[in-house]
């Protein structure tokens, strides 16, 4: 079942949580709502679920208006960050809960409930824990049980609010791969909220970047990473250097450094910022003929196959971060305190708004 929101707006007092947000999610699609705290992503998820009401706009499921439909009638599965499992119930009873509290006319028989629960526990690979209590489970196991409980009522859509946020890094990585595989089996429209860039880029079919109650960009993980639409998206997704210069007729300049600025073909000495990833910066020793930004090597740390360099510009001491392959770093024989030239190889240039 598809999900569509049209012109959603929501305020909490003077705070604007959502500002005319519109989005369409296809059946079977796994979409990540990604952004910093306070950007509106959880509010949007809760309005889709029916846990919050919008001040304006509408929510549609499969093309039908569900804006005023009660949360109990929306057939939405919701997974919270902190599991919300019933401590006094076993794993089996937790998963069966949504089925057992249905109205008598819709409630399955106990035999069907048992079969359904055991099927779901098998799906999340935890059928051997059916008789245990939540306190006897690890964090990753609890989250999988919470997901099984959400699926028990056969939701038309699945919503997850930072489902792995309370788990350690290794468990998060394992569970998000598992969620991707599980989603491919279920083929329902699923939306999950996260502030973890790696999580969104690894798991989702599409990523929705949100900022200050608005959508900045929607696209596949590859699209938003390789072609950020706005300075916010560029700055939010991964590490980036911001180099302030000027653009004229499609060329950005800072001192002797010149880079293409195809988005600014009509610029005339306009202030502009070049966004440069650390791995897109080459290094040369000071005194070479090649153009570059004069810097001094402040600090180096090695992590796996890469060397990460902190460079201080010699004009204003602003920091530039560079990332080079560890073998290349060793072959260059660079030393902390050495004068170098930072040479941006590739950048995306945005005009500074007046």
UniProtKB/Swiss-Prot annotation:
Alphabetized CDD domains for the sequence: ABC_CysA_sulfate_importer (cd03296)
Domain ABC transporter: 3-237
Entry-linked InterPro entries: AAA+_ATPase, ABC_SmlMolc_Importer, ABC_transporter-like_ATP-bd, ABC_transporter-like_CS, CysA_C, Mo/tungstate-bd_C_term_dom, P-loop_NTPase, Sulph_transpt1
Main location: membrane
A GO CC term attached to the entry: ATP-binding cassette (ABC) transporter complex
EC number(s) stated in the UniProt entry for this protein: 7.3.2.3
The entry's keywords: ATP-binding, Cell inner membrane, Cell membrane, Membrane, Nucleotide-binding, Sulfate transport, Translocase, Transport
Reactions listed under catalytic activity: sulfate(out) + ATP + H2O = sulfate(in) + ADP + phosphate + H(+); thiosulfate(out) + ATP + H2O = thiosulfate(in) + ADP + phosphate + H(+)
Subcellular location: Cell inner membrane
A GO molecular-function annotation: ATP binding
Primary enzyme class: translocase
Binding site for ATP: 35-42
Membrane association type: Peripheral membrane protein
Gene3D superfamilies in the cross-refs: P-loop containing nucleotide triphosphate hydrolases
Biological function: Part of the ABC transporter complex CysAWTP involved in sulfate/thiosulfate import. Responsible for energy coupling to the transport system.
Family assignment from sequence similarity: Belongs to the ABC transporter superfamily. Sulfate/tungstate importer (TC 3.A.1.6) family.
Subunit text: The complex is composed of two ATP-binding proteins (CysA), two transmembrane proteins (CysT and CysW) and a solute-binding protein (CysP).
Name assigned to this protein: Sulfate/thiosulfate import ATP-binding protein CysA
Record organism: Bordetella bronchiseptica (strain ATCC BAA-588 / NCTC 13252 / RB50)
Organismal lineage: Bacteria, Pseudomonadati, Pseudomonadota, Betaproteobacteria, Burkholderiales
Gene name linked to the record: cysA
């Amino acid at each position: 079942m598809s999900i569509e929101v049209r012109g959603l707006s929501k305020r909490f007092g003077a705070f604007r949580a959502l500002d005319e947000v519109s989005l369409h999610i296809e059946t079977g699609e796994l979409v990540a709502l990604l952004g910093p705290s306070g950007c509106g992503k959880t509010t949007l998820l809760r309005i889709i679920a029916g846990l919050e009401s919008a001040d304006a706009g509408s929510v549609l499921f499969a093309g039908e208006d569900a804006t005023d439909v009660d949360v109990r009638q929306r057939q939405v599965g919701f997974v919270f960050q902190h599991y919300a499992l019933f401590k006094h119930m076993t794993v089996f009873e937790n998963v069966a809960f949504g089925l057992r509290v249905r109205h008598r006319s819709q409630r399955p028989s106990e035999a069907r409930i048992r079969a359904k629960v055991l099927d779901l526990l098998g799906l999340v690979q935890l059928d051997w824990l059916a008789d245990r209590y939540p306190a006897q489970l690890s964090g990753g196991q609890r989250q999988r049980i919470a997901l099984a409980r959400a699926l028990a009522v056969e939701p038309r859509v699945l919503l997850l609010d930072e489902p792995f946020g309370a788990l350690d890094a290794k468990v998060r990585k394992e569970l998000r791969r598992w969620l991707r595989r599980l989603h491919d089996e279920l083929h329902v429209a699923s939306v999950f909220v996260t502030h973890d860039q790696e999580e969104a880029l690894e798991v989702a079919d599409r990523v929705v970047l949100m900022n200050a109650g608005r959508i900045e960009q929607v696209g596949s993980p590859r699209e938003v990473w390789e072609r950020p639409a706005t300075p916010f998206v560029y700055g939010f997704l991964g590490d980036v250097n911001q180099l302030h210069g000027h653009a004229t007729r499609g060329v950005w300049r800072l001192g002797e450094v010149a880079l293409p600025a195809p988005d600014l073909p009509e610029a005339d000495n306009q202030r502009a910022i070049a966004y440069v990833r650390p791995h897109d910066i080459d290094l040369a020793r000071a005194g070479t003929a090649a153009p570059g930004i004069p810097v001094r090597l402040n600090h180096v740390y090695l992590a796996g196959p890469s060397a990460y360099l902190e460079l201080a510009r010699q004009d204003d001491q602003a920091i530039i971060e560079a990332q080079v392959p560890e073998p290349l770093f060793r072959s260059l024989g660079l030393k902390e305190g050495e004068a170098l030239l930072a040479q941006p190889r590739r950048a995306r240039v945005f005009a500074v708004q007046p």
